[in-house]
Amino acid sequence: MKKIISRYYLFIAILLVIADQFLIRLLLHSDLAAGLSDFAYYLSDMLLNFLVVLLAFIVMVWSGKWQKINSRKFKGSYLFYSFLALLAFVIWNFVTFYLFPPTKNEIAYQLDIPTFTGATAFLMYFFYPVVAGPIFEEMIYRGLVMTALEKGKKWGLDVLGSAALFGILHISNHGWVLTDFFVYMGGGLIFAVLFRVTKSIYWPI
């Protein structure tokens, strides 16, 4: 099994990205999810994402890729790179805020906020966007995607592929608006570069 995964790692990574970006949404927009409460709907979304991330983790471990990006070594330079990435991310958001209209993803979230109450509010105000979401995204779009594209590393394909897929992730459910894509791709590019220079999944998270 490990040899098969290593041999078809790129193909498996593509399938997992498709599952993360499209199959989950198909399930959540099917009749199966029609009768769910808000909390059950968002929890199902999170659990389905967790399942994809778990599969990605298993694939990375069995292929030997995880061992290469699992370094917990602390370096002052990594802390400095993280600070630069955070600064670049803040500047990017500031610039795009004035250059581009609000993204449809952001508008949809703002419209949903008043409906969040009780456990749903905790899930969608804090746990998912602050804790689970960043971990899920980095595991898939930095860990899985960039290790799958590492053969194109010298041409920057790992960074560009990760950033592009990260951008698509955030717009595919709300309409394909080019400015929205650039907003999210820019953020993905920053975290992809941070992952590249630190060689660790933990710093981007």
Predicted segments, located by residue:
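Membrane-embedded alpha-helical segments of multi-pass membrane proteins
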Residues: 43-55, 119, 123, 127, ...
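Structural signal for the C-terminal ends of transmembrane alpha-helices
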Residues: 58-68, 194-197
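Alpha-helical transmembrane segments
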Residues: 6-21, 81-89, 159-163
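Juxtamembrane helix-loop-helix connectors linking adjacent transmembrane helices
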Residues: 34-41, 65-133
